[in-house]
A protein has these predicted regions:
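Glycine-rich His-Gly loop
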Residues: 77-80, 147, 175
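Flexible "cap/lid" loop of the alpha/beta hydrolase fold
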Residues: 154-204
Length: 257
């Protein structure tokens, strides 16, 4: 087994707790906060969050958040399409309050990062994540990726997981690997026509498409008896519309194929 894949395996009890917390937090997709009836008092460290930009080798500005003690174990969050690092805010606050250093970045063309016309593929996503990890000198990090972010994590671990000690564990939440697209070798995948529909909807009316997705299947608000939280829908829409239409269009191929 390649040594770069070993961090994906063999969770200790402590690692399992991190994984379970991340899975629960991501699966709920902020529903817990939406349903909260009592204030939650988090034990957050003093000093305040920090943020900044990292410049990649191809001159792309990648926005990042870096919260918590710099000597604590880092947990690095990788967001899904077409969102930003803001999608992990609730989870970052949770782990920050439990003593971890938490880091997240906006993928190129997403959020506050540069809106460039190229490099919207998994290889570049992983390279950009590596640029952030290098700039912040992250080691022994737990990488958590949701959806497209899961593909980014898998590629990051394989391509940039060495030297030993850089990556402690990887958590893939509802991730895209190994392949979403239906092919002869992947007959249970999603037909290409579905992704073509995404492209058509995005190109014709991105704003409405990004309203319909969270209002319907993304949070399960289209299910019978579901309680709809308008703030969550608007926050999803806000994150999506911050990014580049070109990055989002190209990203459909990146996450599906």
């Amino acid at each position: 087994m390649p040594s770069t894949l070993r961090p994906l395996l063999a969770l200790s009890r402590r690692d399992a707790l991190i994984t379970a917390s991340a899975l629960t937090a991501s699966a709920s997709l902020q529903l817990g906060a939406a349903h909260a009836t009592e204030p939650t008092n988090l034990n957050l460290p003093t000093g305040g969050p920090s943020m900044g930009y990292v410049t990649t080798d191809d001159n792309v500005q990648i926005f990042y958040k870096d919260w918590g003690p710099k000597d604590a174990q880092p947990i690095v969050f990788h967001h899904g399409w077409p969102l930003s690092s803001d999608d992990w805010d609730a989870q970052m606050l949770f782990f920050l309050s439990n003593g971890y250093r938490v880091v997240a970045h906006d993928r190129r063309g997403h959020g506050r990062s540069s809106q460039v016309d190229s490099g919207h593929d998994i290889d570049h996503y992983a390279i950009d994540a590596f640029a952030v990890a290098e700039a912040l000198d992250l080691s022994n990090a737990v990488h958590i990726g949701h959806s497209t972010g899961g593909g980014e994590v898998a590629r990051y671990v394989v391509r940039h997981g060495e030297p030993a000690g850089r990556v402690a564990k990887a958590v893939l939440v509802a991730a895209i690997p190994p392949l979403m697209l239906q092919t002869d070798d992947n007959p249970e995948g999603t037909p290409k026509e579905v992704f073509d529909g995404f492209r058509t909807a995005l190109a014709s009316n991105r704003a409405q498409f990004f309203r319909d997705v969270p209002a319907g299947p993304f949070f399960g608000f289209n299910r019978a008896g579901a309680t709809v939280h308008e703030g969550m829908i608007q926050n999803w829409w806000r994150q999506g519309m911050m990014g580049s239409a070109k990055a989002h269009y190209d990203g459909i191929k990146a996450f599906s194929e």
